[in-house]
Amino acid sequence: MSYKGIYRPSNPKKYKGDSQNIIYRSLWERKFMNYCDLNENILEWASEEFWIPYLDPTTNRVRRYFPDFFIKYKDKDSNIRRSVIEVKPMRETLEPKATKGKSRKTMINESITYVKNQAKWKAAKEFCADRKLEFKIMTEKELGIR
């Protein structure tokens, strides 16, 4: 089930963008938004406020990838760091495996999702390296879910 809604920040000045129109597309994204909003070490944050061009290997066309988050934060040593964050289920970060009972259609769809994600993340890593940013993929493990 997909969850979508508008997040209303408690600290709108920390948000870089339109703080009245912060859209989450999953409960995991909403949880991360709440973390960014309320954590005093997060100095600034944004959600889907910029895009990165990438080559879609399934169509051989240049597409736009909108990373889930950008954060500027103070690390444990009080250094200021900047990261681009993607929130994804662990299963979408791993190469799909054929299992008993998995349909051919499901396997094809999972494979397409996987190769597109890999292309997006490769472009994001290059984009971030050029700008001295970190790129992180956060799964249910990092978000403390399940």
Predicted regions: what is each one?
Residues M1-R146:
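Electrostatic, structured charged patches in enzyme active sites and in nucleic-acid/phosphate-binding
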